[in-house]
Amino acid sequence: MVKRTHGYRYKSRKLLSKKPRERGVPGLSRLLYEYKPGDKVVIDVDPTFVSTAPHRRYQGKVGVVIGTRGRAYVIETYIGDKKKIIVTTPEHLKPFQGGS
């Protein structure tokens, strides 16, 4: 028997697929939204843009913008007690709408 491989997008069929009405490129308001350092954002992976997508474990996580790197944003978030730094483009970010 051969061991099955577990790639980068392993177990993400439902998570990284769009419903028929959501297919295609998202609106310009989402793509051109500018975040400032200190803004809270939600990581919402858009499967249309594969090369800049963060790992699926960060889907739905809330983070803080700590800077930019070219066109991308540097996001600080936590997985348990560990601080993680994510570098991703605005296609995969939404402004955080919750409380403080």
Swiss-Prot record:
InterPro entries: Ribosomal_eL21 (IPR001147), Ribosomal_eL21_arc (IPR022856), Ribosomal_eL21_CS (IPR018259), Ribosomal_eL21_sf (IPR036948), Translation_prot_SH3-like_sf (IPR008991). Pfam families: Ribosomal_L21e. Gene3D superfamilies: Ribosomal protein L21 (2.30.30.70). One of its GO terms (molecular function) is structural constituent of ribosome. Keywords: Ribonucleoprotein, Ribosomal protein. GO terms for biological process: translation. One of its GO terms (cellular component) is ribonucleoprotein complex. NCBIfam families: PRK04306.1. Belongs to the eukaryotic ribosomal protein eL21 family. This is Large ribosomal subunit protein eL21.
